[in-house]
Amino acid sequence: MGGMGGGGLLDIYAMAWEHLRPGSSPVDWCEGNYLISSNIAEFVNTFSNFLFILLPPVLIMLFKEYGRFVTPGIHVIWVLLIVVGLSSMYFHATLSLIGQLLDELAILWVFMAAFSLFYPKRYYPKFVKNDRKTFSWLMLLSAIAATGLSWWKPIVNAFVLMFMSVPTMVMLYTELQRVSDQRVYRLGIRSTTVWAVAVFCWINDRIFCEAWSSINFPYLHGFWHIFIFIAAYTVLVLFAYFYVESELPQRQPLLKYWPKNEFEFGIPFISIRNPGKALRNTI
């Protein structure tokens, strides 16, 4: 029995090492491997995640008021974006299966956290009974289930993420039809445009790699990282605005830009014109 147990443990260690091994992921992007550095598989794809690391701390600062008077959960999302960046850097540096899973799961948890906080109640399923805490528990259980499935069948991740991203953009379009603030509407148009450019980069890198490599530019996945971060965080800012407008209108949300409010290509954030008392039991 002891020998069998030891053998089983060795098998587990061997499997874990296989998943950690560089190149163990079935996914390989267009950029050539180990061309710039002998220690980093995809150099450009690795360091093009810089916005995921640099900008969330700024967003945490800008959303300090929002976190105090609307929901502190907004800061969880900004921290999760850092996790996405670090996971993506690890994946592209190693092309390991564990890196791929960490990258995809971090994105999944950003979606679930955002849905928990900002998903409009009018789209809730009936059994949730219009209760955000119940819906948040549903999202948590869904995230745990999807995480388990992803380790069992990694291919599940791609389908889950695609299933969530397209309806999110459709929902953004629907919400934009309801807003009266033209600054918010313009940000929505810019976010959607950047998202479309990001998807264009992803598809071209994945499907037309040979064509882009023929002109010595196999770096579109790196641009995907930059554009998708801009699209993702601006969409999150928009849904943070929609949430207050819909459920806490007395707070009077206002879209602003940093460092100069008049410059609409700065960093957007939500200011609260009528803070009132800090909320205690907000998810």
Curated annotation (Swiss-Prot):
For the ligand (Ca(2+)), the binding residues are D28, W29, E31, N33, E42
Briefly, what is this protein's role?
A: Hydrolyzes the sphingolipid ceramide into sphingosine and free fatty acid.
Query: What Enzyme Commission number(s) apply to this enzyme?
Result: 3.5.1.23
Question: What family is it from?
Answer: Belongs to the alkaline ceramidase family.
Give the primary localization class. Answer: membrane
- Binding-site positions, Zn(2+): H92, H221, H225
GO CC terms on record?
endoplasmic reticulum; membrane
Per the UniProt record, which residue ranges are transmembrane? Answer: 43-63, 69-89, 98-118, 134-151, 154-174, 187-209, 222-242
Q: Give the originating organism.
A: Drosophila melanogaster
Reactions listed under catalytic activity = an N-acylsphing-4-enine + H2O = sphing-4-enine + a fatty acid
Signal peptide range equals: none
Q: Describe what happens without this gene.
A: Discrete defect in the ellipsoid body.
In which tissues or organs does this protein occur? Expressed in the central midgut of late embryos. In brain, it is present at the interhemispheric junction and in groups of cells in the central brain.
The GO terms this record gives for MF are: metal ion binding; N-acylsphingosine amidohydrolase activity
- Gene coding for it: bwa
Instruction: Name the cofactor(s).
Output: Zn(2+)
Q: How does it sit in the membrane?
A: Multi-pass membrane protein
Q: Which GO terms describe its biological process?
A: brain development; ceramide catabolic process; regulation of lipid metabolic process; sphingolipid metabolic process
Keywords noted in UniProt:
Calcium, Hydrolase, Lipid metabolism, Membrane, Metal-binding, Transmembrane, Transmembrane helix, Zinc
Subcellular compartments:
Membrane
Protein name per UniProt: Alkaline ceramidase
